Structures are given as structure tokens and as C-alpha cells.
Amino acid sequence: MWAHLFKHGFKYEQQNSLSKSLILSVLNSTATKREAKDYLIKYANGSSNYHYLLLIRNIATQSERSLHRLSDSIRRLKFLGISPVCVLLPSGRIQTEVEKMDKLITLSQLKPLVLDYGLSRAFDGSYESIMQTALDTEYCTTRGIVPIVKPYIYDQSTASRGLISDPVLFMDQLSRDSSLKFDKFFILNRSGGIPSGERNQNSHIFINLSQEYQKIHRTLTSSIRTIVERQPRSEDLLDRLELYVRESDIISLEAEYKEHMENLQLMNTVLSNLSSSATGVITTINAASSPSDTVNPLVHNLLTDRSIISSSLPRFKNKSGNFLSPSGQDWYEMPVEIETDEETLQGEDSVFVTTVLKKGVDIKEFDYSHLTSENTVNLPKQFQIKLHDESTYNNSCSKYKLDLVKFKNIIDKSFGRELDLNHYLNRINGKIASIIIIGDYEGIAILTYEGPPDNKFVYLDKFAVLPHLKGSLGISDIIFNLMFKKFPREVVWRSRANNVVNKWYFQRSVAVLDLSMELDEGDMQESEFKLFYHGDPESSLKSIVAIDRLRDLAKYVRNIKPSWVK
């Protein structure tokens, strides 16, 4: 399928035919055409030496068999164009961890190079990476030499080496090393990615750090506080005794959540130092050892720069309302896995234990109903009126104004046709529910209120992403996630019946209706559109299954006139 991409001027410095066969096979099984092209341009031409930071927690407890399985993944990643730099964090078994990491890299058919410290602190308090000062990184990369960085800092003022006390500061300084092109940051552990209450404590699929970091940090802080306080269900003696009996489990649970917090902080700090295209992945050692490229989160992310499944797919529901009790158990009744070998994790699904993270893109939400000269720039004269109703403003974006030139530009480019701006503004002005802007108008969603005054519904009128960014940075997922959170009860949109994106839309909806069907007796019109409906599954069972509701929505959506220049 992708063989033609290796022709027509594309140069790839292959080690042998096996390398080419591996890459083609993997691309066929995992990547879209756009993803394959992006991967080949970036990694497979041999012109750049990309690296990933690899942090493996508790590697000292891993068995020989576990190391063998993981080494296959590291070897595949090297074949596919990216080399590891291994980092250890403080523990009581540093020497054992060094030996295990050395063994892992050797099994990967690479050459380990143990560095006694990672940073050097100068007399003025500044830090410098040893890899930047003491290594020829290009030489190391081309010869398969892999640094293993011990968690120590050399202090020039005392001529001594000390164990790091702040892992986040340590990784912050290491990731600033400009001599290495760090494009990925992988954390492997026992418990997997950052837990999500919306997914029954399975891992977040994707985190846009610029948007979600503070909220997730608060959630983890609250969870840790709940565990630390150790509050019984009641003052009853049996409930208090149960806490005492389960103390060891509670201690393990507390350590696990503190590790999740540190992982989040590490990712936020490191990715902030790297390019906007850099990606982080947190997953289990077992998932990272999968021989299947379609479910191995590390290999899959290298090839596609995304998670194994989309983060905007329907979520699991946690009906208990308890942050660690999807089955109605109390927080201290949750099972805690402390085994580390892979036999205890057989059947583990990579989807549930993996979080992909990016530094992310800025998001602006404009929730005013009217576009006016006070909240919009480049507004046509006939719309330049002043409204003093406070509801027309979004306080969170009071310092920003909507730029209609950029607004129109992204819609024109995304749809491949020209928007009739005056016609469009006449249609939506006064009915705007929200306008979501991603980055510098790299993605946009325009939502309006449609229907009768006493029963309005939210309609996704326009959804656009700049063509060269479609499928990248998770922009579509970010928009749909935010849209569904803002309007959880119901959102409706329409799409041409032959739109190639309809499969993606179908996966995110709970109902689809052909708008050319007979909506009422004798009410049938030609239409090239399908209607998609998304709603909260619990409330939708009552409202959406009622076909009358769908038909009412469909009549309004069917009759919306397009606003394209003819």
C-alpha cells in the first residue's frame, strides 16, 4: 500500500531489505496515508537523529523474560528511526536498576553506556547536561550506543556527586539538552497512564496539557487527600477495623496515586521544553512489550503520533460517583496489583492502560450570541452594532476578539470552497451557542441554537481543521471532547452522505438519520445530508429513542440553507 512512497524522489538509507519490509508491513497495519507520509518524511530518511527519553519505573523487579519481551519493542523503535536515552530515578536499588537497564539495552542489540550522573551544577547554580558536554551524540547514535543516566548531579563547587532530590527538576534540565532531538518521552510502569474518572479509572486516552493539566492535577490531589485521610464509611467498629486490615493495600494505593501525580508533572515539564510536535506516552511495561504493532502504544505512536483509539469516542460511565469505586466499592476496597511480572497482566488491553500527552494547543471559547464590533474584528459594516447585554460576552475571552478574516480562511481551506460571509452571519448572528478556536485558527467549531424558542437544541454548524493538520495534534478529538462536555445533553450535526469522515462521525453519535427519508406523512424532501445525534447515554435512552424527537430535529436541520458562494 505504501510502496509508492519509497519511490519518486524519496530517499531512505536502509540497513537491509528487512528494514524496508518491516517498515512497509508496520505502516500497512497501523497508519493512514497521511500518517505514513508524515512518518517517512520525519524518521525514515536517515537525515535526523531523533531520540526518546525512556523512564522505566521499578525495572529492578522485572524478570528476565519481561526484559526480553520489552527489548523487542526497543529494537523495533530503533529500526523505525528513533533511539532511546534511558533515565533512572532515585530508589533504594539504583545499582540493580542500572544492571537491569544495561541488560535490557544489550538484549535490544544496542550498546549501553552508563553515565554516573546526568547533570553538572556550575558555581553560579546553572545546570548542564553531561550528554551535551561529554558525548558525541551523533557518533553514539550511528553506532547504537545508548546512554543510561544515573539520578545524580555533580556539584562543581564541592567536587562531589549527590543523589537528586527533585525528579521533576532533574528531568526539566535533562530535556533542555539541545544536542539531542528529543521527540518522545515514554514512561513505563506497573499501573499505566493517568486515571480518568470519566473512564471508570481506566487511563485517560489523550491529554492536551495546556488545556487539562490544572484540572487533572486538582483531581489527583483530591484523590490522594482522600486516601491519606483514610476515612471509614462510618464510626462503626467493623468499618474502622476494615481500614486497619486493609492498611497495606491502602499504602500501595497511596503510592500508586502519588506516582501518577509525579508522572503528570514530569510529562508537563519535559514536553514544555520540547517542540510542539513532541509526544509523551505513559503505559505499562506489559503493554509496551506487545509484539503487535497495532496495539503496542510506543510503536503505534511513533508511526501515527496518536493514541491507539480516539479520545473522543464514547466514555465509560462511573455511576458510583466515587473516585475509585466503579463497582460501588469504597475507595479502600479497590484491588491493588503489586505483582510486576507479565504473567499477572495477561489479557491487559493497551487501550485501558495508556495515556498519550502533548504540550497541546491554546483553546479559546467565545460564548456570546451576537458578533459585534465589540467582540469581533474585520466585521462587515452592516453587522457593526453595539449590544450592551452582558450575555453577549464571554468573560474568559474578554481580551480576545474573533478575527473574521482567519475565521473565513480556515472554513474556505477546510471545505475547499468559499464561504458567503454575509449570508452566513445573517444566519447565525443572535443564535450562536459557542465558537471554539484551536490555536491560531488551526481548528474551529461553530455551534448554534436551532429550533423553536421553547425547545432549542445545539447544532454543530461548522467544524473545520486546516488541511495540513487534519489527523495531527488531536485537534478533532480536542474539539469534539470539549463540545460534548459543554453540551452533554445533546448535539446535532449534519454531513453529506458521501463524506469520507462519516465513519468517524458515526462512532461519536448515538443516532443517525437520513434526511431524505419521510419525516412525517407526506413530508419528504431530497437531501444529500445525514443527521448525526450525540447525547448523554443515560438521558438519551429517554429522549432520543423517541423517534418523534429525532424527526423534529431533522426538520430544522434539513432546512438549513448552505452559505457558500455560488
From Swiss-Prot:
The pathway is: Amino-acid biosynthesis; L-arginine biosynthesis; N(2)-acetyl-L-ornithine from L-glutamate: step 1/4
- Entry's localization field: Mitochondrion
GO molecular function terms listed in the Swiss-Prot or TrEMBL record? L-glutamate N-acetyltransferase activity
**Catalysed conversion reaction:** L-glutamate + acetyl-CoA = N-acetyl-L-glutamate + CoA + H(+)
Q: Which UniProt keywords apply?
A: Acyltransferase, Amino-acid biosynthesis, Mitochondrion, Transferase, Transit peptide
Q: Which InterPro entries match?
A: GlcNAc_Synth_fun, Vertebrate-like_GNAT_dom
Enzyme nomenclature, EC number: 2.3.1.1
Which cysteines link up through disulfide bonds?
none
- Give every N-acetyltransferase domain span: 391-557
| BP GO terms, sorted | L-arginine biosynthetic process; ornithine biosynthetic process
Sequence similarity:
Belongs to the acetyltransferase family.
Q: What does the protein in this record do? A: N-acetylglutamate synthase involved in arginine biosynthesis.
Q: What is this protein called?
A: Amino-acid acetyltransferase, mitochondrial
What species was this sequence derived from?
Candida glabrata (strain ATCC 2001 / BCRC 20586 / JCM 3761 / NBRC 0622 / NRRL Y-65 / CBS 138)
Supply the source organism's classification: Eukaryota, Fungi, Dikarya, Ascomycota, Saccharomycotina
Give the gene symbol.
ARG2
